[in-house]
């Protein structure tokens, strides 16, 4: 797989991860929706949380915590991690609180 194709694959995986997390949260928050790409702030709207979703290859928790803290949200913030090798079963994802 070429570098450009790999980059596109990672972006698609990230967008797909946001979507499956939003769908999962709809059980409790029916208006939960993925924001898509290129938007500042929470990756999922329609919940009382500030959520950063990451589909990751490298484990960089300090960078992600810094990113979410810089938003200065008055909501409870957390980071949802989909590690390499994980499918779309959101219950198996990791959550970090900054």
Residue spans for each PLM region:
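Catalytic phosphate/metal-binding cores of nucleic-acid and nucleotide-processing enzymes, i.e., regions
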Residues: 1-96
């Amino acid at each position: 797989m070429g570098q450009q194709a790999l980059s596109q694959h990672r972006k698609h995986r990230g967008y797909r991860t946001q979507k499956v997390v939003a769908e999962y949260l709809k059980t409790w928050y029916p208006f939960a929706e993925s924001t898509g790409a290129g938007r500042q702030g929470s990756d999922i709207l329609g919940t009382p949380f500030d959520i950063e979703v990451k589909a990751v290859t490298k484990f960089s928790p300090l960078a992600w915590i810094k990113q979410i803290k810089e938003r200065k949200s008055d909501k409870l913030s957390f980071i949802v991690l989909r590690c390499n090798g994980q499918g779309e079963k959101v219950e198996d994802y990791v959550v970090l609180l900054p």
